[in-house]
Regions:
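Short conserved active-site loop signatures built around small residues
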Residues: 1-32, 223
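Conserved PLP-enzyme active-site core in the AAT-like
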Residues: 2-3, 16-20, 83-312
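Conserved N-terminal alpha-helix of the aminotransferase class I/II PLP-enzyme fold
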Residues: 41-90, 115-122
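Active-site beta-loop-alpha junctions enriched in small/polar residues
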Residues: 158, 187-189, 324, 350, ...
Length: 428
């Protein structure tokens, strides 16, 4: 199948299984619930382990259900290869660990998911990898923060929880000038609304648990290799360019070519630490992927109507959504998201924690839980939950106030959502 000639809505249904299953003629992708695979002979086994034959070796590394999912997400993002793992957190961790060692450094936007902030601020430093967090509103901050030992710049297409937007092309240019890759989390953006690789990003990560799965039922993460970054020419990434002593002495840039980055994660990090996605979860996430465009269109449509409702409500102090003309990222929103975006955003209730929690506790349709991007509408109070590990200064720097509430707008009928929001606000 010549995927470049097909539209997104077709690719999300067919890539990876262009023909029915060869063993059963099944149209749906089968769940290959197996741990291991039979080699034809000793030479065949050696070729698989030596990466001369790209087939399955062991269930911790590859699975045919997983393979279809990986190929499909990679095609939708415009990348050369994908790797599915057990969670979005695992995807981010592997993406950064793959090209860093003790003594290395990362530059990250500070307006990111609290779990990723914690990884960069507390967990990775225990392994000798430090991070400088910068205010992405001033692009010069990225340039100033890059050091000789910096190995990556990390951002999100839409920040969590406030859906701030960063000039991807400008940050990519800065990173490439210093011969380092731009890694971007496109969980909130989705490849339907934006394909960061087309704007200069080198590696894309997702929590597939969110919009890709879409129904809050299965954990999963994906790493997509853009295939354009020249790891050898950079001279900063011996992990990919020199003989690997724990994998037959191969050079990943030679053995895997444009897919060297994700191939090393699969061959080394996934092999040794095992954050493997289950075949069943890969199947469930594939099911979600097939309706991604339809769901995201409805998410965005509903979100814009909720924003319009909230900005006029007397008990709302502020709405943080880039579609609003007064939002500081509105121009970037129009540039990078011509079809709209940000069904996950925050607003500020007048008062503080007490008022915000009163509003949340009186919602009837919105579910209070630690997830987003479900077809069901969700709500949470970031300061006391998802970002509770941050101190007051860090919360302020990320734009999270005592009265901040995060909404994830689902696909219910918009009239029902507006009625629910109105009655809960009336309880304050």
């Amino acid at each position: 199948m010549e995927t470049k000639k097909l539209h997104f809505e077709t690719l999300q249904l067919h890539v990876g299984q262009e023909q029915p299953d060869p063993a059963t003629d099944a149209r749906a992708v089968p769940i290959y619930q197996t741990t291991s695979y039979v080699f034809r002979n000793s030479a065949h086994a050696a070729a698989r382990f030596g990466l001369q034959d790209p087939g399955n070796i062991y269930g911790r590394l590859t699975n045919s259900t997983q393979g279809v999912f990986e190929a499909r997400v990679a095609a939708l993002e415009g990348g050369v290869a994908g790797l599915a793992v057990a969670s979005g957190a695992a995807a981010v961790t592997y993406a950064l660990e793959n090209i860093t060692r003790a003594g290395d450094h990362i530059v990250s936007a500070k307006t990111i998911y609290g779990g990723t902030y914690n990884l960069l601020e507390h967990t990775l430093p225990a392994y000798g990898v430090t991070t400088t967090f910068v205010d992405p509103a001033d692009l010069s901050n990225f340039e100033k923060a890059i050091q000789e030992n910096t190995k990556a710049v990390y951002i999100e297409t839409l920040g969590n929880p406030n859906s701030n937007i960063i000039d991807i092309e400008a940050v990519a240019e800065i990173a490439h000038r210093h011969k380092i890759p731009l890694i971007i989390d496109n969980t909130f953006g989705t490849p339907y609304l934006i394909r960061p690789i087309e704007h200069g990003a080198d590696i894309v990560v997702h929590s597939a648990t969110k919009f890709i799965g879409g129904h809050g039922s299965s954990l999963g993460g994906v790493i997509v290799d853009g295939g354009k970054f020249d790891w050898a020419a950079s001279g900063k990434f011996p992990q990919l360019t020199v003989p690997e002593p724990c994998y037959h002495g191969i050079r990943f840039t030679e053995a895997a070519g444009a897919a060297a980055y994700v191939t090393r994660i699969r061959a080394i990090l996934l092999r040794d630490t095992g954050a493997t996605i289950s075949p069943f979860n890969a199947f469930i996430l594939l099911q979600g992927l097939e309706t991604l465009s339809l769901r995201v269109e409805r998410h965005v449509e509903n979100a814009l109507k909720v924003v319009d409702f909230l900005k006029k409500h007397p008990k709302v102090a502020a709405v943080n959504h880039p579609s609003l003309t007064e939002h500081p990222d509105h121009a970037l929103y129009q540039r990078y998201f011509p079809n709209g975006a940000s069904s996950i955003f925050t607003f500020e209730v007048k008062g503080g924690v007490k008022e915000a929690q009163t509003f949340i506790d009186n919602l009837q349709i919105f579910s209070l839980l630690a997830n987003v991007a479900d077809v069901k509408s969700l709500v949470i109070h970031p300061a006391t939950t998802t970002h509770s590990q941050l101190n007051e200064q860090e919360l302020e720097e990320q734009g999270i106030k005592p009265g901040t509430v995060r909404l994830s707008i689902g696909t219910e009928h918009i009239a029902d959502l507006l009625d629910d929001l109105a009655q809960a606000l009336d309880k304050i």
